[in-house]
């Protein structure tokens, strides 16, 4: 689960992570009031008005602006709130800005990057720091890897003090700045572990001319599998920032990711789903989604899966690929038949069932009287999808 920048900063602040003072505003008038409050209480020369969407690259897209007065803050908020912001992460459709963060301006001397996430290749959390603040870390890793330090964190002992100091040394900091950076990194790690985050990224981490070390931006992603331990974070979810198909799928506990193709996929198991998508691509098609109905697919989940796939108007054919290990193929076949009778299945549906009770399932489909196209293997299924698309 992703959250907004201001929400992430509120959480980090509770763990002692230094962040600038900021106030969220849902209207231009609220933005003006927030700016007045910051100017009066902090005496800062400028405030920063930042569009709040679940995407990076806001600054380059015009979603981050400076204001020197409450009146200017009002004008900028009028421009931002309600606009569709398009960045390299939003795609061409962009995201609507529904709120802004009004934040005190910083007297920046240096910019860095610091992030903590899970390294799946080593099954350890990894602390990453870079001297290239404000840059995409993937680009830094590819083009100038010498400017990126990765420190593997032992899951038994957690991050040690010497590792935080190593990171601060790598950034070239000294004296008070060094000590502040060590404290910052330590607090960030404690927050990351305590909230069961999948990612805690500060880009940029800034050092001010006064020697302060603060998170100018903050990106927090939660591990969905651990959210049951943090019910206080459920209210932070903003479904307006999520794909509506994915939101609907999550209500039925379906693992769904929308793509930009025209072949709907319903598969049990993530590995088989990815293999199915590859075969569709190799046959000349383009998958419209990733949909894993799970190892215990029931008629209800199959029906919900069909509804979600059919709600995507780009879908021109559907491929159902089920391997019956834990799940019985006849149960899935029953779900397909039931769904087809309830829903207007006006698209060609190619079905490949293998494994437990597959012959029974195939007979059920044959006897159903429905216009379902049977496939004998994955390659055959992908080919029949292409034939169905060509005929439509």
From Swiss-Prot:
Top-level enzyme category: ligase
Annotated ATP-grasp domain residues: 9-248
GO cellular component: cytosol; succinate-CoA ligase complex
GO terms for MF: ATP binding; magnesium ion binding; succinate-CoA ligase (ADP-forming) activity; succinate-CoA ligase (GDP-forming) activity
Cofactor: how and how many bound: Binds 1 Mg(2+) ion per subunit.
Enzyme Commission number: 6.2.1.5
Cystine connections: none
Residues that bind Mg(2+): 203, 217
Biological processes per GO annotation: succinyl-CoA metabolic process; tricarboxylic acid cycle
Cofactor or coenzyme needed: Mg(2+)
Catalytic activity: succinate + ATP + CoA = succinyl-CoA + ADP + phosphate; GTP + succinate + CoA = succinyl-CoA + GDP + phosphate
Binding locations of substrate: 268, 325-327
UniProt KW keywords: ATP-binding, Ligase, Magnesium, Metal-binding, Nucleotide-binding, Tricarboxylic acid cycle
Residues binding ATP, per UniProt: 50, 57-59, 103, 106, 111
Domain of life of the native organism: Bacteria
Biochemical pathway: Carbohydrate metabolism; tricarboxylic acid cycle; succinate from succinyl-CoA (ligase route): step 1/1
Function: Succinyl-CoA synthetase functions in the citric acid cycle (TCA), coupling the hydrolysis of succinyl-CoA to the synthesis of either ATP or GTP and thus represents the only step of substrate-level phosphorylation in the TCA. The beta subunit provides nucleotide specificity of the enzyme and binds the substrate succinate, while the binding sites for coenzyme A and phosphate are found in the alpha subunit.
PANTHER family recorded: SUCCINATE--COA LIGASE [GDP-FORMING] SUBUNIT BETA, MITOCHONDRIAL, SUCCINYL-COA SYNTHETASE BETA CHAIN
Subunit text: Heterotetramer of two alpha and two beta subunits.
UniProt record similarity statement: Belongs to the succinate/malate CoA ligase beta subunit family.
Protein name per UniProt: Succinate--CoA ligase [ADP-forming] subunit beta
Phylogenetic placement of the source organism: Bacteria, Pseudomonadati, Chlorobiota, Chlorobiia, Chlorobiales
GN (gene name): sucC
């Amino acid at each position: 689960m992703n959250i907004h920048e201001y929400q992430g900063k509120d959480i980090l602040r509770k763990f002692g992570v230094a962040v600038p003072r900021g106030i969220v505003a849902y209207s231009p008038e609220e933005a003006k009031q927030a700016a007045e409050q910051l100017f009066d209480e902090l005496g800062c020369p400028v405030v920063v008005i930042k569009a709040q969407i679940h995407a990076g690259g806001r600054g380059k897209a015009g979603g981050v602006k400076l204001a020197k007065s409450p009146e200017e803050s009002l004008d900028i908020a009028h421009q931002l709130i309600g606009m569709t912001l398009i960045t390299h992460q939003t795609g061409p459709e962009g995201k609507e800005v529904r709120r802004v963060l009004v934040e005190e301006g910083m007297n920046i001397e240096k910019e860095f990057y610091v992030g903590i996430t899970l390294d799946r290749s080593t099954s350890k959390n990894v602390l990453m720091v870079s001297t290239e603040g404000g840059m995409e870390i993937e680009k830094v890793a590819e083009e100038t890897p010498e400017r990126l330090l990765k420190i593997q964190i032992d899951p038994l002992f957690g991050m040690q003090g010497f590792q935080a100091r190593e990171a601060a040394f790598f950034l070239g900091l000294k004296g008070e700045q060094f000590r502040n950076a060590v404290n910052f990194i330590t607090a960030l790690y404690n927050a990351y572990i305590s909230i069961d985050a999948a990612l805690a990224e500060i880009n940029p981490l800034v050092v001010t001319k006064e020697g302060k070390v603060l998170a100018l931006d903050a990106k927090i992603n939660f591990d969905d599998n651990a959210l049951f331990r943090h019910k206080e974070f459920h209210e932070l979810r903003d479904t307006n920032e999520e794909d509506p198909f994915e939101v609907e799928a999550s209500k039925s506990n379906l693992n769904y990711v929308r793509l930009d193709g025209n072949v709907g996929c319903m598969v049990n198991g993530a590995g088989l789903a990815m293999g199915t998508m590859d075969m569709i691509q190799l046959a000349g098609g383009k998958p419209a989604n990733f949909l894993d109905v799970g190892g215990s697919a029931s008629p209800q989940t199959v029906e919900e899966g069909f509804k979600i796939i059919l709600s995507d108007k780009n879908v021109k054919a559907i491929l159902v690929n089920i391997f019956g290990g834990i799940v019985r193929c006849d149960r899935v076949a029953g779900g397909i038949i039931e769904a087809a009778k309830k829903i207007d299945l006006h698209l060609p549906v190619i079905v490949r069932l293998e494994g437990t009770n597959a012959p029974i399932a195939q007979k059920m489909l044959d006897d159903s009287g429905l216009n379902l196209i049977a496939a004998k293997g994955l390659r055959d299924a992908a080919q029949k999808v292409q034939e169905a698309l060509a005929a439509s």
